[in-house]
Amino acid sequence: IGYITPLFMILVGVGNGIGAGANSLISRFIGAKDKKGADSATAHSLILSIIISIGFMVLFIAILDPILKIMGASEVLNYCKEYGVVLFIWTFSLIIPTIIGGIFRAEGDVNRATLPLAVTAIANMILDPIFIYGLNQGLAGAALATGIAGLIGLLMQIYWIYVKKNTYLSYSLKNFKNNMKMYADILAVGIPASLEQLIMAILAIIVNFLLTVVAGTTAVAVYTAGWRIISVGIIPAVGVGTAAVTVAGVSYGARNYDKIKTTVRYAVKLGFIVSLITCILIHVFAGQIAYIFSYSSNSSQLAPLITKFLQLMCLFVLFVPFGATAANVFQGLGKGTVSLGLTIMREFILVLLFACLFAFPLGLGEIGVYIGMLAGGFIGSIIAYIIIEIYVKRLIGGQKHGA
């Protein structure tokens, strides 16, 4: 499953990215009080989700063999294919619900945007043992459970849209007219947003390599376990930033640039307060959290190492509201390439630069990698926040000058 995970994460990234693109475009139409345009953008988003799902399903199944061999999975190739082929057949249930979730966010229906995700996660946990052990389906059963769980979330969305018919936006294709510019506008944000998530995955691979070089595989195990907790810790701040996509898009469409300024500052303030609380909790309960990943006799020696990692890297959570808000607001404004540029600057340039600097020339080894990640993340996030503040200030100034 580990060899298939990177490909699975690409699908998740594509779904989230295109969902952000749909959210951005639709919210701008809503802000401009163009209901017809918003409905058209909704229909185009739906069609695009189907096209992309089919495309990635065919592509991933076709290239699965050579990709797995390149990744070094030759010895377990048949096991990987047993899981991967079944999983990719269900690509539609992984991508389409995420994109529809972005559409729900655009119309401000947060409950319907998030409820299917929660139901899917719970259904997956329930179905996994049933298909893997109860029905003796093994790896194929794990993939089938993931696909069916996603389908359950999709069916919930279909029920709201086509049975209850009580959504603000129309998903009807009855009077649909194909507009290539609509697709281009969605992809202008969607592709960069998808690439941002791919960059994060690549960064994790590079960090693993650096840790292997300076400290060995034990450091990688510590980082992998600890970073899961940090990833959970940043979810609230990322959630606030995601909400800012819709608000910024609506405000931009309505040419209410002062509200964009308010959105940026409120999102950062709220995100920072939540992140500060999260940071304190992780630091205080680091030992107890570390025990979760080291309760067995084989991994008990990792507990103090994971504890130290969490007590240091919990500081990373504090920087996220600044960078995430800036990136998401730029997405809401339809400036996906700017958002991507900020992510590349922060992750590929600053984080890696400082991680290598502290680990090698300064000779700090493993701890140097972590300090470098903190330094790069802090500087990159602050730069991103300054850039969005300057951009919004110019929008407001240009509007006043034009008036």
Task: Locate predicted features.
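Hydrophobic residues within alpha-helical transmembrane segments
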Residues: 4-7, 14, 47-51, 89, ...
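Short runs within selected transmembrane alpha-helices of multi-pass transporters and secretion channels
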Residues: 19, 23, 86-105, 113-124, ...
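Short alpha-helical transmembrane segments in multi-pass integral membrane proteins
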Residues: 26-90, 136-191, 248-315, 359-403
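Transmembrane helical elements of multi-pass membrane transporters/channels
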Residues: 86, 120, 149-153, 157, ...
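Helix-terminus/linker motif at the lipid-water interface of multi-pass membrane proteins
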Residues: 68-74, 130-137, 201-228, 232, ...
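Small-residue-rich hydrophobic transmembrane alpha-helices
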Residues: 1-57, 94-113, 222-286, 320-339
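Alpha-helical transmembrane segments of multipass membrane proteins
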Residues: 58, 66, 99-103, 122-130, ...
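Small-residue hotspots at the loop-to-helix junctions and early N-terminal turns
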Residues: 2-6, 80, 84, 143, ...
